[in-house]
Amino acid sequence: MLGVDTGARAGLRRSLEDRSPAGVAARRRFLTEALGQLRRQPRTGLDPATVTSLAVAESAFRTALDGTALPYGVATIGDWRNTPYVVIQNVGAWLDVPQMLDGDQPVRDRADAEAYLARLAATAAQLDGETVRSRQARAQGLVPPSFLLDKTIAGMTRTIAEAASTGGPFVGPLARKAATIQGDWAPRAAAIARTTIVPALQRQLAELRAQRALATDAAGMGTRPRGAEWYAWGLRAGTTTRRTPADLHAMGRARLADLQAQMDVILRAEGLTQGTVAERAIAFQKRPGIGFPDGDEGRRQIVAYMQGRIDAIRPRLPRAFRRLARGNLEIRRMPLAQEPGAPAAYGGPGTIDGRVPGKVWVNLGDPSIHNRVTIPDLVYHEGIPGHVWQGEYAQALPLIRSILAFNAYSEGWALYAEQLADELGMYEGDPAGRLGYLMGLAWRAVRLIVDTGIHSMGWSRDRALAEFVAATGLPRSNAESEVDRYCAWPGQACGYEVGRAEIVALRSRAQATLGRRYDLRDFDQAVLDGGNVPLDVLAGNVSRYVEGARAS
């Protein structure tokens, strides 16, 4: 983890995770041993923070261990990106390594530059480890949907061409970062890319093409070996609950109906009275002044508009938090190879030492997917007071707590952060922005519907796209990236609304219990200071805050 790879741990910045079958087996042994130690640890006499840390680690390790018992896929330890497919359009070292080297790997001196090269030299082995696991999964009958493989093959083909000619995304970051450091860094990096990484990528591409020859357009896990079992685990990992697909599907339907009623009020006030809510929302987004130009000028304006929204909310944050984080943030275009299969944006905090800022990675491949309706909500979710903001509080916790994360908390907080932006008045006099906020909430409600529809009810990709577009009013290009993401990460999309709903329910209970003693700043601080936790642990943290507030 960058930011802690100093001193005795400095060697970490030269290495990469072992993604081979042996690496997975080693992680399983670690999880088994660590979980046993945690369960044997007495809780009596420990302070609440330590008890919480033990509960968090035990939950993360138990879920990951259960995931590694499944015959295929990626089961992360305290992270959100669990997937049945080791390599796909948004998963794999072919994407992770370039992004990490570009966005997070520090290059301040010769030692840092050598560490970059060491990681580059380790990349081929990481790629080959993934290829072996992908081949093993194919032998068990697991093949991704054809439409995901088409995106992956196209993106990897472009990456190989770039890496073979100039070094592409593997070399460019080092050439830029080491420009003032004496040494032949870029030529050395290009040689590594050309002689080791490109051949490994070609081997991985050959495996993907072998899978494509067997692939069908079946989108969900229901048609795949042990798919229902994998999806049940994916939902548990993604929501930190045992809620069933049917329950989550119904929850999404009810939430969507409420949000569409609110959207209808805005659209009617704007003179849009004919057609469905989604059709009218689409029409509103086509009005002059809502979109951005094509090409680089549009990309520049999009980034500037996003930055403007971040700048505007900062002065209002003291109304929602007792203690302000730094909010160390920059907006960056995501790697080009990633854009075709990626969402509109995603974000996260920087390094623990603060030297590398948090990022909102924005998809600028097609500027038309962004407009002045959708951007404000997007940056509050990904940036401040969403993922980047929350992540900085987590980094103040003990190291194990800053590393472990739970999808339902992370995404639930970011969705709640969108609500905070509304409550802080960010949409006053801005019907376009408030419509986008409601569209964003509807989008997350639809995720419950579509994710469970694909993986539990046997929906096709076309059925999922039709449901998504009809419900949200988002452009079809956005919908395709979203639906394809749900196909690649079963269960992950359900954590957003489940997490938000739990935070809001806990807030309502705190208000009812505390009455005049309730203060939004204290509630939000309790949710953040308790760290990234499973939802049952979050409920306990909030209960302790309420008890303390009543006692005072």
Predicted regions: what they are:
Residues M1-S552:
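N-terminal maturation segment of proteins
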